[in-house]
């Protein structure tokens, strides 16, 4: 799993995460694909680090929307998408 993979899966979520549009089905599909491809602890930590890094570099991200995204898509992930998340603690 690479940050490129994460970015590809999450690209359709950007407008929603900026509060600039509705939640597209493609975004939830990306969230589900990402969860399904992160099968090991290392993959989950990589995905976490990539998500946190991307959320800091994309301007205008609403972290409330980001944190709620997995639940809105019906997916459970073992960490919060937040700048303060310590990805090294993800199992």
Swiss-Prot record:
Subcellular localization(s) per the UniProt record: Secreted
Segments traversing the membrane: none
Stored Gene3D superfamilies: Plant lipid-transfer and hydrophobic proteins
S-S bridge residues: 3-50, 13-27, 28-73, 48-87
Keyword check for Disulfide bond: yes
Keyword Endoplasmic reticulum in annotation: no
GO molecular function: lipid binding
Name of the protein described by the UniProt record: Non-specific lipid-transfer protein P3
Organism: Vitis sp.
Taxonomic lineage of the native organism: Eukaryota, Viridiplantae, Streptophyta, Embryophyta, Tracheophyta
